[in-house]
Amino acid sequence: MSPRTAAALRDGDRSLREHLIATAGALMAEEGAAKLTVRAIARRAGVADGVLYNHFADKEELLAHALRAHVRGAERALGDLPVAGDATVEANLRAHLAYGLALHRAILPTFAGLLAHPVVLTRFAALTPTNTEWRDRLLTYLHAERDLGRLSSTAHLDAAAALLVGACHETVFSALVPHAGPAPAPSLDDVVATVLEGIGA
């Protein structure tokens, strides 16, 4: 291992591969992904450019892993989601929506920067376990509340989840499209109240 590589791993027992992923993920969070280069990643990681290709088939593989690390880091920073049966459904949905908006604000700019790199997005999707994204967890929560009798037994939960996720998409995506101008963020209370009119017990 070269002195530069050794210096790059001073944080502990993390492998060089993990170090490169973490470094690329940090750069994504700070600067976006559109102009992220192998040289920039290597320089931040403290290694020679060619070292990256000892651990990844290509730049796209590294970026896919870095994107996953970026998303997981954003999720960890936001903390835990409400548990079905605790508090009130209204309060829990408000917490879910606030979480979704914060998550989208943290990660959608990075995804937007990768729209011209579909290979990275495809590989990211392959790395992501099923039923682990926020929408999946929201839907699981809604089903659990319905099973507890706190939502209508005939509630269309897929539609309710789509409304909540859609509110996040519109608010954040509109800010990323300069000619459209940002859409005003909807009131969390208004969105939750509208959803509960359709699915409340």
Give the positions of each predicted feature.
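C-terminal peripheral helix-coil segments that are non-catalytic and often amphipathic
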Residues: 1-4, 91, 95, 102, ...
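Short, Lys/Arg-enriched anionic-surface-contact patches
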Residues: 9-16
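Helix-turn-helix
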Residues: 19, 23-61, 65
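Hydrophobic alpha-helical connector segments
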Residues: 65, 79-106, 157-164, 188
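Short, basic, alpha-helical segments at the C-terminal edge of helix-turn-helix-like DNA-binding modules
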Residues: 68-74
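Amphipathic alpha-helical packing segments from all-alpha helical-bundle domains
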Residues: 75, 103-113, 121-148, 158-162, ...
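Helix-loop "lid/cap" segments that line or gate small-molecule binding pockets
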Residues: 82, 95-103, 111-120, 194-199
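Conserved hydrophobic residue
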Residues: 151-152
